[in-house]
Curated annotation (Swiss-Prot):
The lineage of its organism: Bacteria, Pseudomonadati, Pseudomonadota, Gammaproteobacteria, Enterobacterales. Gene3D superfamilies: Butyryl-CoA Dehydrogenase, subunit A, domain 3, Flavocytochrome C3, Chain A. This is Cytochrome c-552. CDD domains: NrfA-like (cd00548). Transmembrane segments: none annotated. The gene is nrfA. Ca(2+) binds at residues 215-216, 261, 263.
Length: 478
């Protein structure tokens, strides 16, 4: 305490001349300081943070692409009419953030800045260039327009300035200086009573991850990113919020249901689980302190599976050995996956049965309660499985959400059976062969050969133009 008082007196003594000067020369008001431009080139910070930089760069080793649609073709039906039915890979290293959003079939094959299916907001979790553009153009300026408009500007992979105040003197000295670089994330945290500036160090460590590893939607004409937390963070709270504002991400092309697509709600599910409730942060498990060759501790930025650094992560709290904990996690994962598949089977049938009812002349009023059940069932299923780590973060909450999803899907199918009977249809509705991704995509009418050909042309012609322009503008490290 004495040390704090001495520092305070010293600072005050240094400020006295400043106060005196401004009182005498009040008319000479200083111009506001120009904000320091966000530096998006991650390599810039390698000299001050060499270990962190090299470990971040090592996320390029996490290069495997896992096709989730090939593993589970039911997803194609659930997302019929939405870009996810074309292409959905499981996540890989941060070093591929820009590459993957460019190359996914979901972003289409735009020919110019005004072309393509998706908005600028789809860049928002991919690069520190997003923070740079928001600072430069404001949020409205950044979000305005199509995704392709950002191609020549958003070129550096998710990195330093996404989570750190890289312009601060403290960061230059090797301190972390965490920050929320996305203003919409800061507002969302305030909405749940967690203003970043007042949060403790452990809360802040998870909040910076929660800028991206969250559920969000595109709000208003400008398609700005917003987190649906106004009514709370549980699946029912967000469902209520979306229903209240009559929001939908798309309409399923089979059942004509206005649907919700969950993104990657790790922050919400972590908060609901035992680790979140005990403030065991994302950093504790995914970015542990490790030693470099000289024995100096640093935060490992090769974000990955905690079991890969068991001694520095799990073993800090748990007395069980690695094999025992892996067995527990595997069992939880299997339980969640088993229920996930059962819910998906019910939803696949519900979408095709709803299509049959519509084809038989069912009215909008007759379909409304059924579509509400389908919407809510699939939303709860999606929020449970879109967080790939829910079996670790909150297995009980995952099973609970899937259980309520199963109930809602069953309600929809019961109502559909009654409605179909009134239309003279009492036989079972046949489901086409969806045993592979390709067959499922054919069943919903996707011309995948054309979609893939257009994408390959885009990759070969448009992306090189973006990169050339970025280099000319000094946005990429040479």
């Amino acid at each position: 305490m004495t040390r704090i008082k001495i520092n305070a007196r010293r600072i005050f003594s240094l400020l006295i001349p400043f106060f005196f000067f401004t009182s005498v020369h009040a008319e000479q008001t200083a111009a506001p300081a120009t904000p320091v431009t966000v530096e998006a080139k991650n390599k810039t910070f390698a000299p001050q943070h060499p270990d962190q930089y090299l470990s971040w760069k090592a996320t390029s080793e996490q290069s495997e692409r896992v096709d989730a649609l090939a593993e589970d073709p039911r997803l194609v039906i659930l997302w019929a009419g939405y870009p996810f039915s074309r292409d959905y890979n499981k996540p890989r290293g941060h070093a591929f953030a820009v590459t993957d959003v460019r190359e996914t079939l979901r972003t289409g094959a735009p020919k110019n800045a005004e072309d393509g299916p998706l908005p600028m907001a789809c860049w928002s979790c991919k690069s520190p260039d997003v923070a740079r553009l928001i600072q430069k153009d404001g949020e409205d300026g950044y979000f305005h327009g199509k995704w392709a408009r950002g191609g020549p500007e958003i070129v550096n992979n998710l990195g330093c300035a996404d989570c750190h105040n890289t312009a601060s003197p403290e960061f230059a000295k090797g301190k972390p200086e965490l920050t929320l670089s996305r203003p919409y994330a800061a507002r969302a945290m305030e909405a749940i009573g967690k203003p970043f500036e007042k949060a403790g160090r452990f809360d802040q460590q998870s909040m910076v991850c929660g800028q991206c590893h969250v559920e969000y939607y595109f709000d208003g004409k400008n398609k700005a990113v917003k987190f649906p937390w106004d009514d709370g963070m549980k699946v029912e709270n967000m469902e209520q919020y979306y229903d209240k504002i009559a929001f939908s991400d798309w309409t399923n092309s089979l059942s004509k249901t206005p649907m919700l697509k969950a993104q990657h709600p790790e922050y919400e599910t972590w908060t609901a689980g035992i680790h979140g409730k005990n403030n065991v942060t994302c950093i504790d498990c995914h970015m542990p302190k490790v030693q470099n060759a000289e024995g100096k501790l640093y935060t490992d930025h090769k974000i990955g599976n905690p079991f890969d650094n068991f001694a520095q992560t799990c073993a800090n709290c748990h007395t069980q050995d690695k094999a025992a904990l892996q067995k527990v996690v595997a069992e939880r994962k299997q339980s969640i996956n088993d229920l996930k598949i059962k819910v998906e089977d019910q939803l696949v049938h519900a979408h095709f049965e709803a299509k049959a009812a519509l084809d038989a002349g069912a009215t909008e009023a007759e379909m409304k309660p059924i579509q509400d059940d389908i919407r809510h069932a699939q939303w709860r299923w999606d929020l449970a499985i879109a967080s790939h780590g829910i079996h670790m973060h909150a297995p009980e909450e995952g099973l609970r959400m899937l259980g309520t999803a199963m109930d809602k899907a069953a309600d929809a199918r019961t109502k559909l059976a009654r409605l179909l009977a009134t239309k003279g249809i009492t036989h079972e509705i046949q489901i086409p062969d969806i045993s592979t991704k390709e067959k499922a995509q054919q069943a919903i009418g996707l011309n995948m050969e054309q979609i893939k050909a257009e994408k390959q042309d885009f990759i070969k012609t448009v992306i090189p133009q973006w990169e050339e322009q970025a280099r000319k503008n000094g946005l990429l490290s040479q």
